[in-house]
Swiss-Prot record:
Keywords (A to Z) from UniProt: Ribonucleoprotein, Ribosomal protein, RNA-binding, rRNA-binding
PROSITE patterns per record: RIBOSOMAL_L15 (PS00475)
Biased composition (Basic and acidic residues): 1-11
Cited function: Binds to the 23S rRNA.
Protein name as it appears in the record: Large ribosomal subunit protein uL15
Subunit comment: Part of the 50S ribosomal subunit.
Disordered: annotated span: 1-44
Amino acid sequence: MSDPIKLHDLRPAPGAKKAKTRVGRGEASKGKTAGRGTKGTKARKQVSAAFEGGQMPLHMRLPKLKGFKNPAKVTYQVVNVSDLEKAFSNGGDVTVADIVAAGLARKNQPVKVLGNGEISVKLNVTANKFSGSAKQKIEAAGGTVTEAK
């Protein structure tokens, strides 16, 4: 019985690993043109990936982007009056923190209340913004509206 094979004794079979040809390193081994043929752009330098053989390239065919992104834009978390009625059916005071705790909006972002749906519960709502119809519906139900800064 022979010795067991050890990991450090493993070698590739003879001829299994062929050394890569180093081109352009002397006349004997693919020197001079190094497999690029003779003359022409591709023999002299690398052609850029954007070059399309003289056709108008894609990045020049497409239109430029116009306009800009307003850095002062405020994106509000939207909550409807009907959502407030479902979440706070007992009535009372409702703040932005309460709306976030109820899972109606994300925290650390301003909240705007919109007037979609109906409300019959008396709520004293404090939020960052209100639509006109939301104000009317909340006040018609006997509640109050306060805009927080």
